[in-house]
A protein has these predicted regions:
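Extracellular/surface-exposed low-complexity segments
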Residues: 26-28, 502-559, 564
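Bacterial N-terminal signal peptides
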Residues: 9-19
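Short acidic/polar inter-strand loop motif in beta-rich domains
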Residues: 618-628
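Structural signature of tandem-repeat unit edges
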Residues: 45-51, 69-83, 92-105, 115-129, ...
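Beta-strand signatures of extracellular beta-sandwich domains
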Residues: 579-583, 613-615
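Consensus positions within tandem repeat domains that build extended binding/scaffold surfaces
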Residues: 85-88, 107-112, 131-136, 155-160, ...
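Sec-dependent signal peptide cleavage junction
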Residues: 19-27
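Exposed aromatic-hydrophobic patches
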Residues: 570-571, 600-607
């Protein structure tokens, strides 16, 4: 009995000791090789003491003070603690952190979601690393952020969804800023912040690092920076001063500065080879950014889609020799540029809408490297005052490529096969010479154009679309449009054959060469048709004085003279065998005479006036001349 009582007493004492030990373990313990924790429930203070590094916890609910997470008000880090571990204090209710003076590293997600933290946050000068998401979603931090002088790395999302105000200075010691480091969602960020100053040893700025922040004024990217990530400063609409890019910058990510409000000029530094998609686009701003000159580097190879769209640059745009590609919408609605847009021959592709609504350019020189003019790529360039030459090698002009660009004249290459839908809609006020080899003219390609000549279509033409040469304006028919088309080959397919969709104005006559196929009877697809053989009077033929050129627009070196007594014209070179029709016009475009030249010396034109123009056309099976020549003062009164 005595032994039983002794055993019972011993067991009771042991159980009591275990309970007391368990209670003590619940408010204190070890949290690193030489680090310890204790929680004072009366003050809500969690103290980390000892020395060295704290333990890293794999998950955010693994830390030993998890049971007191909602009761913790203050976290005190001892002076000998050097590292705050991963996932050490996430989602705690603390409102105050007291850092020790020797903390060198703050681990990933260390204070993630501590939304009761408020006001300012100051990191001690000893801190070198702020880990990924270390203070992410600490939404109560609305004061200023002060970073220590020894800080080197700011991790991804380190201050994500914080709401700091005031100026931010990134210390000179910092070398990298991680992705989304200072990003805040719209409903959390303040209306305005102070200025942003980047340290002079910074090398990389991560994706969306400052995206949608409210920093104001100018921004200088230090010379030390080599890479700016995608959307790094995207939609920083309060950055309304100048942007200065460092001379050692090599990579600028997509949309890096899209939606900012910078003013002044912009110089892209040498060494940059690509301007990525939307890098400087101002699409969603109420007004465009940049007001001065754009300077591009000689190292540039690629200009991405929407790279500079909706910006307000002024002056000339100089595309460097060596650029091979200009993306879709690259300069869309950049209407402040002036002078001639000259694309170097290195350019192989110009994307859709690339220069849409660039109405300040007065001239356009296209690259010899192009093979296709893309959809709307040069549309609505209202200010063009010089002829546009489509270079040899281009086989297709895309849909609406030059729509509403109002160019005074256009010259087509011998390689052209297809002219797309609305390609020159409401654009031309001139004579048009189509090249041999052209096969397709699509719907409304030349609708609402004031074509100042008969439409002469090569033997290669196969299809003409709906309203291709429509001349009915909403406010009346244009009286200057000629009333006929002249075909040098077989009858093509006319896609538009009825009423409002007809390929030509309904009152046009179609003229064809005898012996060519498909022309039968008196009408074709609803149009009156008549044969012409080179001796038929072309009463409705109009021309402008474009100089003496062949049908490929190459200049012809020749000489000729007019006998003032007889009116006989003598040409010093052969114009190929076959009949040549000559028609002269007065200054108003009215036919004044017609003649036939069968040899180079046997040709008499009657009733010529000194204001007349002479039109020569070789009407043989392979026409080679389509040449207006100014008579000037050689003709008799």
């Amino acid at each position: 009995m005595k032994k039983y009582l002794i055993r019972l007493l011993f067991a009771t004492l042991l159980l009591l000791a275990l309970c007391i030990g368990a209670s003590a373990a619940g408010t204190s313990g070890k949290c690193g090789p030489s680090a310890y924790w204790s929680f004072d429930s009366s003050t809500g203070t969690l103290t980390i003491s000892g020395s060295g590094a704290m333990e890293d916890y794999e998950y955010e609910n693994d830390y030993p003070w998890m049971d007191y997470r909602d009761s913790i008000q203050t976290i005190v880090i001892g002076d000998q603690i050097t590292q705050i571990g991963r996932n050490t204090f996430p989602w705690t209710a603390c409102s105050t952190i007291r850092f020790g003076k020797n903390v060198r590293s703050i681990g990933a997600r260390a204070f993630y979601g501590c939304r009761n933290l408020n006001g300012d946050l100051t990191l001690p000068d000893s801190v070198q690393i702020v880990g990924n998401d270390a203070f992410s979603e600490c939404t109560g931090l609305t004061g200023t952020l002060t970073l220590g002088s020894s800080l080197q790395t700011i991790g991804a999302g380190a201050f994500y969804d914080c709401s700091f105000s005031g100026n931010l200075v990134i210390p000179d010691s910092v070398t990298s800023i991680g992705r989304y480091a200072f990003y805040s969602r719209p409903y959390l960020r303040p209306e305005t912040q102070g200025t942003l100053t980047l340290g002079r040893n910074l090398r990389t700025i991560g994706e969306s690092a400052f995206c949608e922040s409210r920093y104001t004024g100018s921004l200088t990217i230090p010379d030390s920076v080599v890479e700016i990530g995608e959307r790094a400063f995207c939609d920083c609409g309060n950055l309304n001063g100048t942007l200065t890019l460092g001379k050692n910058l090599r990579t600028i990510g997509k949309k890096a500065f899209s939606g900012c409000a910078f003013t002044g000029s912009l110089t892209i530094p040498e060494g940059i080879t690509e301007i990525a998609i939307g890098t400087f686009s101002s699409l969603y701003q109420s007004s465009g950014m940049f007001t001065g000159k754009l300077t591009l580097p000689s190292t540039l190879k690629t200009i991405g889609a929407s790279a500079f769209s909706y910006t307000d640059f002024s002056g000339e745009l100089l595309i460097p020799d060596g650029v091979t590609s200009i993306g879709a919408n690259a300069f869309e609605e950049c209407d402040g540029f002036g002078g001639t847009l000259s694309l170097p021959d290195s350019v192989k592709t110009v994307g859709e809408w690339a220069f849409y609504l660039c109405k300040g350019f007065t001239g356009l020189k296209l690259s010899a490297g192009l093979t296709k003019i893309e959809k709307l790529s040069f549309a609505h360039m209202y200010g063009l005052k010089t002829e546009v030459v489509i270079p040899e090698g281009v086989t297709e002009i895309g849909e609406s490529a030059f729509q509403c660009s109002h160019m005074p004249s256009v010259r087509f290459p011998s390689t052209l096969k297809k002219i797309g839908k609305e390609a020159f809609y409401f654009s031309l006020n001139c004579k048009i010479a189509f090249p041999d080899g052209l096969e397709v003219i699509e719907d409304e390609a030349f609708a609402l154009c004031n074509v100042k000549s008969a439409v002469i279509l090569p033997a290669s033409i196969k299809s003409i679309g709906k309203k291709a040469f429509d001349s009915d304006w909403s406010y009346g028919k244009h009286n200057d449009i000629p009333l006929g088309a002249y075909f040098l080959g077989a009858a093509p397919q006319l896609v538009g054959t009825g009423n409002a969709n007809c390929s030509f104005p309904s009152d046009w006559t179609l003229n064809y060469l005898p012996g060519t196929s498909g022309w039968m009877g008196d009408t074709y697809e609803g149009y009156k048709i008549v044969p012409w053989d080179g001796e038929t009077r072309w009463d409705n033929l109009y021309t402008d004085d474009f100089g003496y050129r062949d049908n490929k627009w190459n200049k012809i070196e020749t000489s000729w003279s007019v006998n003032p007594d007889t009116g006989k014209i003598t040409l010093t070179d052969d114009l190929n065998e076959g009949c040549v029709v000559a028609v002269s016009y007065d200054a108003e475009g009215r036919v004044t005479s017609i003649g036939v030249l069968r040899t180079k010396t046997d040709f008499v034109v009657l009733n010529l006036q000194d204001t007349c123009r002479l039109f020569l056309l070789n009407a043989s099976s392979a026409p080679r001349l389509n040449t207006p020549v100014t008579i000037n003062d050689y003709l008799p009164v």
